[in-house]
Amino acid sequence: MASAVLSSVLTTASRFALLQVDSGSGSDSEPGKGKGRSNGKSQTLGNKATSNEKKREKRRKKKEQQQSEANELRNLAFKKIPQKSSHSICNVQHELSSPNPAQKESREENWQEWRQKDEQLTSEMFEADLEKALLLSKLEYEEHKQDYENAETASTQTKGINKKDKRKNHQGKDKPVTVSLKDFQCEDHISKKAEESNSAQTLSHDGGFFNRLEDDVHKILIREKRREQLTEHNGTDNSPAPEHNQEVGLKDGRIERLKLELERKDAEIQKLKAVITQWEAKYKEVKARNGQLLKMLQEGEMKDKAEILLQVDESQSIKNELTVQVSSLHAALEQERSKVKVLQAELAKYQGGRKGKRNFEPDHCR
């Protein structure tokens, strides 16, 4: 909207640039003429004087244009209607009275250009306002969506209550029913909510509501443009060729703007696609690294487990061998013990027999 306002300011400021200021030209040219008549100078001096006068007029025009532009900008900034000065009105009347065909043609061309610019600006501003209104309506609908849902539930409840009331009324038609003020207000509030819920349901069920609304807005714009063209045609007896050219120019300008927007959006999409591909490549790399790390960890764990199991098996086999050796040694020890006992018994017998023989021999000698 700010850009539209600035553009409108520029257009209004530049309109007054087309007006010529001839108020001081007469006063400055008259003494020159008098001097030429009185003194009777040559043509060269007259040309120089006219060139100087033209330069002065140009300077004055520039100053007046700058002043008018500054005043209009001030008035627009403080929301005041720009008041045309009497000096500018006199200049306009003087220009209209001067019958110069070249100036008339240039004015008509400039007028047509400014009219085209004004129409384009007004149409763009109107479309922008309509788009804003559509967006606001969408936002309001989204904000009040839950309210509509609550209203739907309330409407279902009210329907059930109304059915019960109807049954009661059918049963007792002759009996007058008294309703309190609170109940009456509640019923009105519930009925309003039910109407709002019904409208919300129609909006929610109709998915293409906003699309149809945009189409209607486009149709309205086209109708208004046609009406403006017809009014201009009736007011000013001009041929329909420039109007058609204006329509074509407006359409071409819109098409070019849309093409530029599409190109810009396509470039943004391409950039986003490139970023997505980069992130996908990085994601795949990270995934592959994680898979390799997981495999390495699993292999390390399996190796550790296998080594531990081998050590356990070896220790178990060593234990079995040692138990076998111990059992065999224990059996050999028992055998040796039994042998020792037998030998001890034999030795004891042998010693006892020798003692008896020794005792028997001396007795026999006596």
Swiss-Prot record:
InterPro entries: GKAP1. Induction: Down-regulated by TNF in adipocytes (at protein level). GO terms for biological process: G protein-coupled receptor signaling pathway coupled to cGMP nucleotide second messenger; positive regulation of insulin receptor signaling pathway; signal transduction. Residues 20-115, 146-175, 228-250 are annotated as: Disordered. GO terms for cellular component: Golgi apparatus. Changing residue 178 to A: Does not affect phosphorylation by PKG. Predominantly expressed in testis. Expressed in the adipose tissue (at protein level). In the testis it is restricted to spermatocytes and early round spermatids. Also expressed in cardiac fibroblasts. One of its GO terms (molecular function) is identical protein binding. Residues 104-115 have a biased composition (Basic and acidic residues). Interacts with PRKG1. Interacts with IRS1. Belongs to the GKAP1 family. This is G kinase-anchoring protein 1. The gene is Gkap1.
